[in-house]
């Protein structure tokens, strides 16, 4: 009898092991965390091998060991101009604003968005919820950079990393002169700087391009930008840093409005996990080194630069979504035929951050009911309160489709509130693609909005569960 029981137990163990292996196989996906800081093969295509950088600007990234375990990765970055710049920045709306946010906001207000020379950034420690001492540390970082530039009160500060810990400030400030000496204007200098601001990012995010303005058709202007962020990403803004520099002569009087317009349509239209960080900052510096007529309000140059900056910011923001923690998909959410742009944005945002939608996409499941569910509750003010008359969403007029990125016809899931007979094989083909668009037609107006998001995978939990270790 003991032998028989042993045999049965052995078979059960083998069956259990087989089930475990089967489940592991089912649950596995194409994402895998980078090894030893290497860039995943699928992400290498997003890292530029050359660039066109604005005149008068230089950049650097060095390792100082903000985190004691980091002995190789760059973690302090400098981006600066050889002359004072007009500058503007958009900051997080989180009530617990980090010390560098408070410092940089105050500096821009004091200087009237003028006379800014550069930006100093550290990764590995957010310097957030660190009290008066943290604010003093942000000031010390700026002062160390100012001394290198031969200026005073001319440096913005950014930090990213773990919240609630003080910076190893002496280690940082004593090495800022070394970062200054390492500055240069080549592509490698800019790319190293972009690497220095990363935390859980799997690849550095850097874009550069040239453009023209109507009043100076013979002048080639340049714009370059770097950003970071892979988690705690949600509008207004997220654990997201962005530095954009241009050699166009943009007036300090219009720079804040131009930047806000661009950010609202780019960095404030992405979400990874719905969390808004304490440190979010996107800064724009314009030094006018390329010459030409100053860009001021109510001119063709203003409109042209606004378009350039918005398109540029959108491309930068999309890189953040493509590097979402554990993400395997890049998803565009488009809500059209809405009664108002505000309603369209709210619905798109709600769909984009829905855990049920995001996990269904990861599982390659055409569960359009989750999309419809998010659409239905998105404009209800608060759970538990009586539902208001939400006239912006009329079930009988609502349509939902998958739009393939390979150029083939859309797959209709819901038409005028009635479910379609879904071709599951076709749906599976679409959901196998890395890029996907979800289109919601409301049929209640002519406004629209677009959000970009990614899926949720098992790795998202692993990355964030291990973040402080």
Swiss-Prot record:
What pathway does the annotation place this protein in? Amino-acid biosynthesis; L-arginine biosynthesis; L-ornithine and N-acetyl-L-glutamate from L-glutamate and N(2)-acetyl-L-ornithine (cyclic): step 1/1; Amino-acid biosynthesis; L-arginine biosynthesis; N(2)-acetyl-L-ornithine from L-glutamate: step 1/4
Instruction: Cite the SUPFAM superfamilies for this sequence.
Output: DmpA/ArgJ-like
Catalytic-site annotation from UniProt: 239 (nucleophile)
Q: Fetch the CDD domains from UniProt.
A: OAT
A GO molecular function held by the record? glutamate N-acetyltransferase activity
Relay the record's extra comment: This protein may be expected to contain an N-terminal transit peptide but none has been predicted.
**Name assigned to this protein:** Arginine biosynthesis bifunctional protein ArgJ, mitochondrial
Species of origin reads: Neurospora crassa (strain ATCC 24698 / 74-OR23-1A / CBS 708.71 / DSM 1257 / FGSC 987)
């Amino acid at each position: 009898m003991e032998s028989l029981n042993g045999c049965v137990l052995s078979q059960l163990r083998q069956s259990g092991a087989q089930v475990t292996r089967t489940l592991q196989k089912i649950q596995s996906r194409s994402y895998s965390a980078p090894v030893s800081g290497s860039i995943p093969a699928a992400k290498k295509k997003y890292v530029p091998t050359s660039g066109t950088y604005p005149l008068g600007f230089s950049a650097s990234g060095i390792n100082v060991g903000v985190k004691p375990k980091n002995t190789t990765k760059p973690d302090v970055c400098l981006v600066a101009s050889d002359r004072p710049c007009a500058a503007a920045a958009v900051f997080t709306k989180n009530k617990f604003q980090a010390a560098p946010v408070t410092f940089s906001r105050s500096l821009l207000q004091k200087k009237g968005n003028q006379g800014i020379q550069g930006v100093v950034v550290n990764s590995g420690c957010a310097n957030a919820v660190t009290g008066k001492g943290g604010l003093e540390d942000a000031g010390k970082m700026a002062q160390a950079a100012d001394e290198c530039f031969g200026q005073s009160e001319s440096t913005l500060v950014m930090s990213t990393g773990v919240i609630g810990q003080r910076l190893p400030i002496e280690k940082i400030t004593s090495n800022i002169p070394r970062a200054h000496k390492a500055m240069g204007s080549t592509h490698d200098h800019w790319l190293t700087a972009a690497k220095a601001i990363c935390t859980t990012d799997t690849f550095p995010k850097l874009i550069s391009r040239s453009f023209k303005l109507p009043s100076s058709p013979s002048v080639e202007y340049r714009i370059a930008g770097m950003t970071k962020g892979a988690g705690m990403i949600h509008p207004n803004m997220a654990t997201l840093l962005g530095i954009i520099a241009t050699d166009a002569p943009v007036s300090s009087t219009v720079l804040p409005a131009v930047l806000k317009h661009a950010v609202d349509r780019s960095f404030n239209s992405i979400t990874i996990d719905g969390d808004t960080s304490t440190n979010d900052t996107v800064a724009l510096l314009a030094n006018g080194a390329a010459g030409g007529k100053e860009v001021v309000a109510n001119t063709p140059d203003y409109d042209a630069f606004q378009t350039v900056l918005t398109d540029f910011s959108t491309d930068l923001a999309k890189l953040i979504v493509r590097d979402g923690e554990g993400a395997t998909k890049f998803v565009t959410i488009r809500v059209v035929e809405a009664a108002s742009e505000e309603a369209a944005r709210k619905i798109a945002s709600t769909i984009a951050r829905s855990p049920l939608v995001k996990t269904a996409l990861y599982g390659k499941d055409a569960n359009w009911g989750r999309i419809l569910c998010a659409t239905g509750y998105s404009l209800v003010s608060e759970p538990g309160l009586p539902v208001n008359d939400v006239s912006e969403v009329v079930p009988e007029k609502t349509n939902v489709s998958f739009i393939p990125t390979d150029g083939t016809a859309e797959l209709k899931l819901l038409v005028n509130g009635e479910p379609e007979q879904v071709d599951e094989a076709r749906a599976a083909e679409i959901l196998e693609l890395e890029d996907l668009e979800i289109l919601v037609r409301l049929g209640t107006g002519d406004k629209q909005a677009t959000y970009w998001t990614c899926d949720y995978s098992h790795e998202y939990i692993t990355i964030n569960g291990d973040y402080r270790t």
